[in-house]
Structures are given as structure tokens and as C-alpha cells.
Amino acid sequence: SPCFRKEVGAHGIEERGVYRIHQFEKQEMVVVCKPEDSKAWYEKLWQNTVDFFRSLDIPVRTLECCSGDLADLKVKSCDVEAWSPRQKKYFEVGSCSNLGDAQARRLGIRIRSKENPKELYFAHTLNNTVVAPPRMLIAFLENNLREDGSVAIPKPLQPYMGGMTELRKK
């Protein structure tokens, strides 16, 4: 989905370049489910992001947001952060949120009970930013860069790179 950031250029030197750009794309996962399934879906969505980055040999950690820091509507949220060897710190590369039934109430999204077809209840909604390519590119290059300037290609990407195992300047 296309995204636009208002505060471009409002931060320090560490956030120049592709880290904080005005317009970018990101790949989202959205789930609309029964209330009793939302906790399991939250775990699946979060795990998808963590597994994706780890498959690219990018170290990640997860920060659970405390209730006082949750944005409107969110019941639970966490940020996935990747390690930056250059900055020697983690930076945000994704987030996962469970909005409970709050968004469904605003949008009127209801589920009909199988047991009692006359009974309607509000769905739960969740979303997960799997990857924002500009930040993923930073994490990928920094964590796969070798001393000689070549970039290692992780095994899951090699079939899509014609079997290449590294990128090297000619």
C-alpha cells in the first residue's frame, strides 16, 4: 500500500536517505476474524514478520507497546526492530496490531453466529506491516555486507537470483 509521511526531514542525520522518506510502499497483512481467534492471529502475523527478516539473516527483536503508548483503537501492539551494524542499534522495520472489535464497530463489520443465525457480533481486526522495502533494504544490506564490499545473498533468495550467492562490484 502506498504511504505518505508528513514529517519528512524533521529528524536528525541518522534518518536521512531512504530511512525516512516522504512516499514509500509497504506490504500489509490484514485479518478480519472471530473474537476468539484474534489472539492466535496476532501471534501468526507477528511471527510472519520475524521469520521473514530472520530468513534474510537479519537479527530482529520485538518490543511490546505498553498500554499507555497504544494508539487509538489498539488493544495490543508490538514493533519489530532490525539490527543496524552501522548505527549499532535497532530500528523499527514493522509493527503488528490487534484492534479488537473497535475498528469493526466503526465500520459495522459483523459476524453471524453459526449456532444461532439471528445472533450477530462484531468481528476483530488486526493488521501487520510485514515489510516496508526502504527499511528492509537498509537492514538487508547492512547485515549481509562483507568486509570485502560484497553482499551475501541469503539462501531463500538464491533461487530468485539465478543461484548467485553474493553481489559483487565488477
Task: Please provide the spans of the model-predicted regions.
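TRNA-recognition modules of translation machinery and tRNA-sensing kinases, especially anticodon-binding
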Residues: 1-170
